[in-house]
UniProtKB/Swiss-Prot annotation:
The keyword Phosphoprotein applies. GO terms for biological process: amino acid transport; protein transport. Residues 1-25, 423-444, 538-569 are annotated as: Disordered. Keywords: Amino-acid transport, Phosphoprotein, Protein transport, Transport. This is Protein LST4. It holds the Pfam family Longin_2. It comes from the Eukaryota. PROSITE patterns: DENN_FNIP12 (PS51836). Belongs to the LST4 family.
Length: 828
């Protein structure tokens, strides 16, 4: 609730300012940052990135990309509703400033604000002269840009009242942290005030950031507080060294006051200053931007039947298209999350689930399936937007007339969602030839067929032989391979490779639709070593991926856009390319089979209306209800004994009542969404569930992030799912201490006041749960969970295949099966 109140006070005037250019070193690589010492007024270019010396894992080239470009433009509306519960998600804009339609446009001004990279560091010391007007000394002043901006326009002398507050001293030497907004500006001031030895010698560390980041300050306070503590220790170390130096020279007495103003910290301690700045620039600020700008997944309530129907149909499509009759990849992955990671990811903040894939559409579909098994889910009511049935029917008729769709029975389309866009199955070869003559000129990639103009496109190098490869007698769920590779002499090579594929494998072009009994068959086990291996503390050189799309990926990182890769043979099994919106025209329409009719109007989640932004759900109704109950309480709301104390001239009437916080109150809808997100162009250390491009670079970033997590914990864990190689790995990394120095065994090494050093080694343990189509060695509990998941999916398949069952009974049974999966560990 505090975040909502803070957000409502945030002004939107600063968000609408467009920047013609940006010279921030965080945005543009190899641009120097400028560090200015207030005492001398000189500028010098900062040295290289010097970060934490405990575990040297970061390099300047590995700075996390946290800018959220309009990547949602490449996602269909149906998939947006699955992942986020809304078609429109505003970037860096409070909910109370949204338009009446519940969303914003995708223009660059409202989506991206590059000035959120800017920040300012101020270190100010009180001179101890109460009667003097100039009672404060500027020790250090740093900003991210040499260009004059709103942060530099405010002089430090104008900030002293906001930093130190009242000149009245407290009786004890207390330390305080303050967060406040600066009037008539779009800035937030975060300040820590502490003392060294004297009451009248206060020191302030102030961080000035754009007010657009205020809603995520509370969530990211642990990283901000850690940076303030490190900076405070650094300044105290400077003062201690200066005091020891004065004691050795005989210039120190009991009445002497050690001042930072007597130390030129920029000249004497350049390395420490660089560590302070770069830690803020490469860790804290990217974390704030990630929390603010990257959209988070919305976990639907488990009692929302429309979501449950869509979720089961997504599972059926994945198994039929991706897994094949014998693979069992998805049931094993679901069982791994249900039995283990569902609880681990909530209790262990350093645990992560990462999907590695070169196809954004595939990864987002799998994220939707897996996120439904995680907690915490939304427990409030979901608003369903009403619409005119007559307008829907007219829209459907227009779609049929424009696209000339072939009518199909309702039962044949029951397992398809509107985002799949698969080609329909022909009844036989004769009907196939007859229907081809009646197909209209609208192709798969035409705007009439897809609702989006921007899409995940295959590079449209067209030639006369471009066509769609479709096997005879194939079903609706078969993988349709695009013939976007070169024709000519190489065509026989690809044809022979497709024919040589085994007819039952998940990558075969000629795989027939399996029966329900063929979906779940045991796969051969894979033995491996599960012992802990010692890991080097220093990271090696990062290896670049050698895929054909690496050059385009590198270009897309600089342009902050989602990489659009050309297909390769190893990526054909990741999902049908026909399911991507805005695909180019493929082949001659006279040889293409008829299309499935557009069933987007039957998508169960199409009328979901959720007010949210990137990180929070709007709960204005709950706030209004709570304030009404406080201001106008009723006897029913009190529900217990109460007492009223009459007021007097000093205070108003006071009502006291018993507070009984039960489980029902604690399970109220959560405003802040969990740190689960979608497919990102780079791996992001600040999210626990995500997808990113496959390659050595992503795996290196994941390993480095696990080492960074060990700076504040002794154990971290990640579940890596590679869709390209069909690989599931459970990677655990822990830190074992080998020695004990300074007799600090009774202190917590992660305490901010701990100053000792202990030797340690990093050990890594990797379990191959699934590799190369084979299931690894599983525990008994995991095997039981896999069997339970398979039986549940079988029951759901038979439930949805039964056309004679009542709709209400189907809804209740589907909810029961889904609830048994979600609460499996509690029941078992």
């Amino acid at each position: 609730m505090l975040g909502n109140l803070l957000r409502n006070k945030t002004s939107s005037s600063g968000f609408e300012k467009s920047s013609e250019h940006s010279d921030f070193s965080s945005v543009v690589p190899n641009v120097p940052v400028y560090c200015k010492a207030a005492s001398t007024g000189t500028t010098k270019t900062a040295a290289g990135a010097l970060l934490d010396t405990a575990v040297n894992v970061e390099k300047p080239s590995e700075m996390l990309s946290t800018t959220s470009p309009p990547i949602l433009d490449h996602i269909s509306d149906d998939l947006k509703l699955k992942l986020f519960g809304s078609r429109d998600i505003p970037y860096s804009r409070p909910i109370d400033t949204l338009q009446n339609n519940g969303g914003l446009g995708t223009d660059k001004i409202t989506s991206i604000n590059e000035k959120t990279y800017a920040f300012r560091i101020l270190i100010i010391e009180e001179a101890g002269q109460m009667a003097c007007r100039n009672n404060y000394r500027d020790i250090f002043d740093y900003t991210t840009s040499k260009i004059s901006n709103s942060m530099e326009q405010i002089r430090p002398s104008e900030l002293k009242e906001y930093i130190f507050g009242s000149p009245v001293r407290s009786s004890d030497l207390t330390q305080c942290d303050k967060i406040r907004t600066i009037p008539n500006s779009d800035l937030v001031l975060i300040t820590r005030i502490f003392y060294y030895t004297h009451q009248y010698n206060r020191i302030a560390i102030s961080l000035c950031i754009p007010r657009i980041l205020l809603p995520v300050v509370a969530e990211s306070w642990s990283s901000i507080s850690s940076w303030l503590t490190q900076t405070q220790k650094m300044l105290i170390g400077f003062l201690t060294k200066n005091r020891i130096m004065q004691e050795n020279t005989g210039n120190y007495s009991n009445n002497s006051v050690i001042k930072l103003s007597n130390i030129d910290i920029r000249t004497h301690y350049p390395k420490e200053i660089e560590i302070m700045v770069q830690t803020l620039q490469k860790r804290v600020i990217p974390g704030l931007r990630s929390m603010s700008e990257i959209p988070r997944l919305f976990l639907y309530p488990e009692t929302f039947k429309e979501f449950v129907h869509v979720w089961f149909k997504s599972i059926f499509n994945w198994i039929e298209i991706k897994d094949g009759p014998k693979l069992g990849f998805l049931p094993l992955l679901m069982a791994m999350i249900i039995s283990d990671y569902r609880h681990t990811i909530r209790e262990l903040k350093t645990s992560k689930i990462v999907i590695l894939s070169g196809n954004m559409v595939v990864a987002n579909k799998l994220l939707f399936i897996l996120s439904a098994l995680l907690e915490p889910k939304y427990k409030g009511q979901i608003t369903i937007r009403r619409e005119n049935i007559r307008s829907d029917s007219s829209a459907v008729s227009r779609n049929k007339s424009n696209n000339n769709f072939v009518d199909k029975p309702e039962t044949e389309l029951s397992t398809l969602t509107s985002t799949d866009n698969l080609l329909s199955r022909t009844e036989n070869n004769s009907n196939h030839n007859c229907n081809n003559s009646n197909v209209s000129s609208n192709s798969i990639g035409s705007p009439n067929f897809h609702s989006l103009r921007k899409g995940w496109q295959i590079p449209n190098r067209r030639n006369s032989n471009t066509s769609v490869s479709v096997s005879s007698s194939e079903s609706l769920a078969e993988v349709i391979q695009p013939s976007s590779f070169k024709s000519g002499s190489s065509s026989l090579h690809y044809l022979s490779s497709s024919i040589s594929s085994q007819p039952g494998s998940y990558g075969s072009w000629f795989n027939k639709r399996p029966t329900i009994s063929q979906f779940f068959q045991p796969s051969p086990s894979l033995k491996h070593n599960e012992s802990w291996e010692r890991l080097q503390t220093t990271a090696g050189n990062m290896q670049r991926t050698s895929s054909s799309s690496s050059l385009q990926q590198a270009t897309s990182r600089l342009s902050l856009t989602t990489p659009q890769q050309s297909p390769s043979i190893s990526e054909y099994d990741e999902y049908p390319w026909m399911g991507t919106p805005g695909s180019p025209n493929v082949g001659d329409v006279s040889h293409a089979p008829p299309l499935v009719k557009n069933i987007s109007y039957k998508f169960p989640l199409k009328n979901v209306e959720l007010k949210r932004d990137c990180q929070r759900i709007s709960q204005d109704d709950l706030l209004d209800e709570a304030f009404e109950r406080i201001c106008q309480p009723s006897l029913a709301d009190l529900n217990s004994t109460y007492e009223i104390f009459p007021g007097n001239s000093s205070y108003a009437d006071i009502l006291t009542t018993d507070s009984d916080i039960d489980d029902g109150l604690m399970n109220k809808p959560l405003e802040l969404l969990p740190k689960y997100t979608m497919y990102l162009t780079h791996f992001n250390n600040f999210f626990q569930l995500q997808a990113c491009p496959a390659g050595q670079e992503s795996e290196s970033r994941i390993t480095n992030s696990m080492k960074i997590d060990l700076l504040k914990a002794d154990y971290t864990r990640s579940l890596l799912v590679s869709l390209r190689s069909r690989d599931i790995r459970d990677v655990a990394l822990k830190r074992e201490f080998t020695g004990n120095n300074n007799n600090n065994s009774n202190q917590n090494i992660y305490d901010e006041n701990f100053v000792g050093k202990r030797k340690y080694v990093l050990k890594q343990k990797t379990r191959k749960i699934f590799s190369c189509g084979k299931i690894g060695k599983l525990s008994t509990s995991l095997e039981n969970c896999v069997n339970f998941v398979e039986n549940s999916i079988k029951s759901a398949m038979m439930l949805y295949d039964d056309n004679g069952i009542d709709s209400e009974l189907r809804d209740s049974e589907a909810l029961r099966i889904f609830s048994s999966l979600v609460h499996y560990c509690n029941a078992g």
